[in-house]
Amino acid sequence: ASCLVGSEMCIRDSYKAHDVHICIGTGKHLSDKNRLKYAGNEFYFKSQDEMFSLFKQFPEALENTRALTDSVDLQIPMEDYHLPWYTIPGDKKSKDIDEYLKTLCSSGLKDKYENINTEINQRVDYELSVIKKMGFASYFLITADFVEYARKNKIPVGPGRGSAPGSIVSYALGITNIDPLKHNLIFERFLNPDRISMPDIDIDFCVERRGQVIDYLKSIYGEDSVTQIITFGKMNARAVIRDVGRVMSYSYSEVDKIAKMIPEGPKVTLDQALKQNSDLRTVSQTNYKDLIDNAKVLEGMTRHASIHAAGVVVAPGDLTDFVPLYRSSQGDVTTQYDMKELESIGLLKMDFLGLRNLTVIDKTIDLIKQRFNEDIDIDKIDMEDPKVYKLFAKGLTVGIFQFESAGMREFLKKLKPKGIDGLIAMNALYRPGPMQNIDRYIKRAHGKEKVEYVHPLLEEALKETYGIIVYQEQVMQIANIIAGFTLSEADEMRRAIGKKIRSLMDKMADKFVKGAVKNGLSKAKANQIFDLIDKFAQYGFNKSHSVAYSYIAYQTGWLKTHYTAEFMSANLTSEMNNTNKVVVLINECRKLNIKVHAPDINKSGINFEPLNDKEISFGLNAVKNVGVKALEQCIDCLLYTSPSPRDNLP
């Protein structure tokens, strides 16, 4: 025999909050009679002395329990990586994984560049040396393999995402479709040899076929080695007030008033809100004390679990050898560890994101093929088409990826971008924080405000953005040029500033100033430049990501410019479940002199379809409460009774 007690909470004083938590999870109120409830307040984690006191009449059971716990020797290795081993194809000469990666890169570069110069060779050799040193060749080969699978099976893949476009190895392997040298992207922003951590390659796929790529991974590495990742919905300050208030039967108006006293934002805590808001402090000391007290205990706890929208994990063997699994009520299997925890134990996690806009591009290309029998390779379109930039300059960007908000359209009209660099900068600037620099950027771009640099050495890093820090990579360049930092050190400085790690920031500031002085700057000027970096770097955007997403924006803009009816039809079809968005897109069609016909069971199909350059038939699947199967039956009947119902369109 051994001694055990049920432990539902850490300390006895949490029993009231625990009762509230049960009600939140079961959708009950504290006042409900027939609800799940623990008897008493003893279901907490007991101390050693408490256990001895409880079971003092059973000394043998106590000894058995001690022996049992002493025999447990659980060690979870946190330093090792557990990457699945990439199997080199049997017909390949090289059996060394690093050599094989090098061979694939050499082959890929020939497809990407007409002339492979010294700069290209040096960059590739450097990146490969870092990848070899860090032991990540398998990671790149595995990623390249499933991306190649997607492309071969005509599953739309994005040009890149996050910091991965900063790698020429990723470009050579076809993982990304962005030339990092052309856009002055920095490898260390993606993979820092001084900071041992897994590379992070996020991939965008067509939203409708993302699952097919996951199935491919399972077919290669085994069903038991690949699964999706759990994510936990946490109770933040506002949410926990609303949940606790409901369970304690306070009126909606009372709870709503208290919740709105808390500043918005996921990182705002109740303690912070209580310090900032005197009204909330007053409330917490009066009739709502129990509500606030229970909410403070439950704040940050898990409310529910769900499947991460993008996360996939691949293990070198059965996942159960590395991580516990969870089966949802719907039967879906995920890890019990979230993304950060999986990374901490060294498992390979990837983000497979379903991007609607890639589906729109794919559907548009299909419609073009149907109407004109033309094959469009979206990755090979002219990236300097003045007609496309004219569309952006007019602000006609409804339906254009990343550029369709009203505020963005107004800034585009002012900027009038004439090249991809303008789109990249605007994409990075139109975000909270850097948005304050947009007007200044536009004035300088048009020569209405003088471009000035705090020091002439800054021109090299800031010339492309008219002296304004826009990108995180520019912060790294400044540290490299001014203070002599290596790009790895510069990335550490960028991270410290971006994440506001004060101890590391102070250390980096001291090193920056000393390096700048050694480079001939005065201490005052060095401090001035670091203060400038500190001010803007926390808002700086990842240029690699901005470049990749601006490419998608341009591709959608190109399709809208040259195949307007097809593009708008595909966009409308992709948004059929969003009535408000359908209305916005139909209004845009009117501005473009394209008529969207009213739904007509005799003339419409399931999806929106272009009838000609100026007319689109309404997709019946956009009609609420009408299912696809019913529509298919109706259309089959029409096809049976009338071979060409659309021939009668006005």
State where each predicted segment sits.
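Flexible glycine/acidic-rich beta-alpha junction loops that bind and position SAM and/or redox cofactors
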Residues: 8, 12-18, 80, 84
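Acidic, His- and aromatic-enriched active-site or binding-groove loops in soluble protein domains
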Residues: 21-29
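Structural signature of the thiamine diphosphate
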Residues: 60-84, 234
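Conserved small/polar residues in nucleotide/adenosyl-binding loops
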Residues: 4-5, 9-13, 640-647
